[in-house]
């Protein structure tokens, strides 16, 4: 049986310590890219996301990858299609591509893993995070944003997503 070239690349061991990864201040939270598509031969991308209490990710849909949410600390209400789950530490929620989803962080804040499959080496979550964030000076949450995003900022994000073909904001 012939193996896919990306699968062969995934055979290289990768280890990322808890204090390692590419830390970015992203949309008011902290995103640490732990495993890239390149690291895993295109099998997955893993991003550790820490959010302030009350943060809401807008309703959106991915077209090229599936997204899993593994809650490490805190809590969030996660909606995927018609399913709503109050997720706490240790819970996992799977969001298949083409199904709209969103979350609202609970009063404890949260730290969770986004597990995206397959890992997209171009035009995926890694590119989106880098294009819409800044390097974190330390792997800590940024200050709480003083204001909500402006309509112009939201439209800019919508345009970026549409141009990439990766995802779409449904707001």
Residues covered by each model-derived region:
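Short acidic-glycine-tyrosine-enriched beta hairpin
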Residues: 15-18, 39, 68, 75, ...
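Double-stranded beta-helix
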Residues: 108-171
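A short, N-terminal "cap"/entry segment at the start of jelly-roll beta-barrel domains
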Residues: 1-44, 143-171
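Short, conserved beta-strand element in jelly-roll/cupin
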Residues: 46-53, 61-80, 115-118
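Short loop/turn motifs at secondary-structure junctions and domain boundaries
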Residues: 40, 59-60
């Amino acid at each position: 049986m012939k193996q896919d070239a990306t699968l062969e690349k995934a055979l290289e061991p990768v280890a990322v310590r808890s204090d390692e990864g590419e830390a970015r201040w992203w949309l008011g939270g902290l995103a640490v890219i732990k495993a890239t598509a390149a690291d895993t031969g295109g099998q997955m991308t893993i991003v550790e996301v820490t959010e302030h209490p009350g943060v809401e990710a807008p309703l959106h849909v991915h077209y090229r990858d599936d997204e899993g949410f593994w809650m490490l600390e805190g809590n969030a209400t996660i909606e995927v299609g018609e399913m709503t789950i109050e997720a706490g530490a240790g819970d996992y929620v799977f969001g298949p591509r083409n199904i709209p989803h969103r979350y609202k962080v609970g009063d404890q804040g949260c730290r969770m893993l986004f597990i995206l499959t397959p890992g997209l080496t171009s035009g995926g979550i890694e590119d989106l995070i880098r294009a819409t964030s800044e390097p974190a000076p330390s792997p800590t949450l940024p200050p709480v944003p003083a204001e909500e995003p402006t309509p112009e900022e939201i439209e800019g994000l919508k345009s970026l997503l549409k141009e990439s073909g990766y995802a779409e904001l449904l707001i």
